């Protein structure tokens, strides 16, 4: 973190610098003009994590500033949503005089939504007892007069949910509202308003699609649920069980009837498609019945592994969302042999950092 860089008056210049850097890095692929999707310059992060410093009777949040090489007190935090900032102040006021709730508390995580829900996770270097549970329940009751809040307590090999361990986000995407269950400690897009722009862009570039869609690394179904309207059927894979469970919830709550989620890794699915291995998880699913002309990939920072990359190259159209331009560039070295980049986008999920989220549509040459 570099707090000094978080200056809204410099946001436009920083975003322009990112665009130029991205264009230069990918010039060899003869990409079309970069479509740039800006963030709000402040209060854009829907989640935030803070360490907690104890100093006598005082108690405050802090982060580590890599430039100053020191901890920095954070009573408020410009990148975090307005809801998180409101909760930060209300929560610390409650925690300071309460020995049971503050004792050996070392971290607080916040997960908020545009729909107004917020989840607070309190992390401790001690085991939590009935006294903690009682005090936490009373805290939740008091905070509930101002917030739609849930509280979780965590310690080594211990997790206490006072009510539920998730929030439900509602995103207005074009003329539709999609609802997404977001589970504590699982991946979610941190910048909700930019996430909406990503969904709208993905819907736009896949308009008038033929056949079915295959998605790898689908998470909680964020993209596949929104894209289902553009395809006959959608087949999606995800390995993490909490994400698969959330995806099934999201499919039901959004009334999606043409989306099938399979719990398996991209590598396993590649083997299944190549008939190298059989999986019990695929019983009752006729892979050969799917006519997937388009594949959607949103891989981790490491990019796509070689075997899966070969699978991806077999599709007419490839929609690739990347959180790491370096591994995207490496993957494009291979994909560019058979496919051409026809759409190219920069999504500024993380203002005031070097991080660049990109979207690429490739079509067979």
Swiss-Prot record:
The active site is at residues 323, 357. It is an enzyme of class 2 (transferase). PROSITE patterns: SAM_MT_RNA_M5U (PS51687), TRMA_1 (PS01230), TRMA_2 (PS01231). The keyword Transferase applies. GO terms for cellular component: cytosol. GO terms for biological process: tRNA methylation. InterPro entries: MeTrfase_TrmA_AS, MeTrfase_TrmA_CS, SAM-dependent_MTases_sf, TrmA_MeTrfase, U5_MeTrfase_fam. It comes from the Bacteria. One of its GO terms (molecular function) is tRNA binding. Its EC number is 2.1.1.-, 2.1.1.35. Pfam families: tRNA_U5-meth_tr. CDD domains: AdoMet_MTases (cd02440). Belongs to the class I-like SAM-binding methyltransferase superfamily. RNA M5U methyltransferase family. TrmA subfamily. This is tRNA/tmRNA (uracil-C(5))-methyltransferase.
């Amino acid at each position: 973190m570099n707090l000094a860089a978080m200056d809204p008056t410099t946001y436009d210049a920083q975003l322009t610098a990112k665009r130029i850097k991205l264009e230069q890095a990918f010039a060899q692929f003869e990409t079309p003009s970069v479509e740039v999707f800006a963030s709000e310059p402040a209060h854009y992060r829907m989640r935030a994590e803070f360490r907690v410093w104890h100093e006598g009777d005082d108690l405050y949040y802090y982060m580590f500033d890599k430039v100053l090489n020191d901890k920095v007190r954070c009573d408020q935090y410009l990148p975090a949503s307005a809801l998180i900032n409101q909760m930060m102040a209300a929560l610390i006021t409650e925690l300071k005089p309460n020995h049971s709730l503050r004792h050996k508390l070392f971290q607080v995580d916040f997960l908020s939504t545009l729909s107004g829900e917020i989840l607070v996770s309190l992390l401790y270097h001690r085991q939590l007892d009935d006294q903690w549970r009682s005090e936490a329940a009373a805290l939740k009751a008091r905070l509930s007069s101002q917030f739609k809040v849930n509280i979780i307590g965590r310690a080594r090999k211990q997790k206490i949910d006072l009510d539920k361990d998730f929030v439900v986000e509602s995103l207005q995407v074009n003329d539709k509202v999609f609802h997404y269950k977001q589970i504590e400690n699982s991946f979610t897009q941190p910048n909700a308003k930019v996430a909406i722009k990503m969904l709208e862009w993905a819907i736009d570039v896949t308009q008038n699609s033929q056949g079915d869609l295959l998605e790898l690394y689908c998470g909680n179904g964020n993209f596949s649920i929104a894209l289902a309207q553009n395809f006959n059927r959608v087949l999606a894979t995800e390995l993490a069980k909490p994400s698969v469970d959330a995806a099934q919830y999201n499919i039901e709550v959004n009334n999606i009837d043409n989306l099938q989620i399979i719990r398996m890794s991209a590598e396993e699915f590649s083997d299944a498609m190549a008939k190298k291995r059989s999986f019990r998880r695929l019983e009752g699913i006729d892979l050969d019945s799917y006519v997937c002309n388009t594949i959607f990939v949103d891989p981790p920072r490491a990019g796509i592994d070689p075997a899966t990359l070969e699978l991806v190259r077999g599709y007419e159209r490839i929609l690739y969302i990347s959180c790491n331009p370096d591994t995207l560039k490496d993957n494009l070295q291979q994909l560019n042999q058979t496919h051409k980049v026809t759409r190219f986008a920069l999504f500024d999920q993380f203002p005031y950092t070097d991080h660049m989220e990109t979207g690429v549509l490739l079509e067979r040459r």
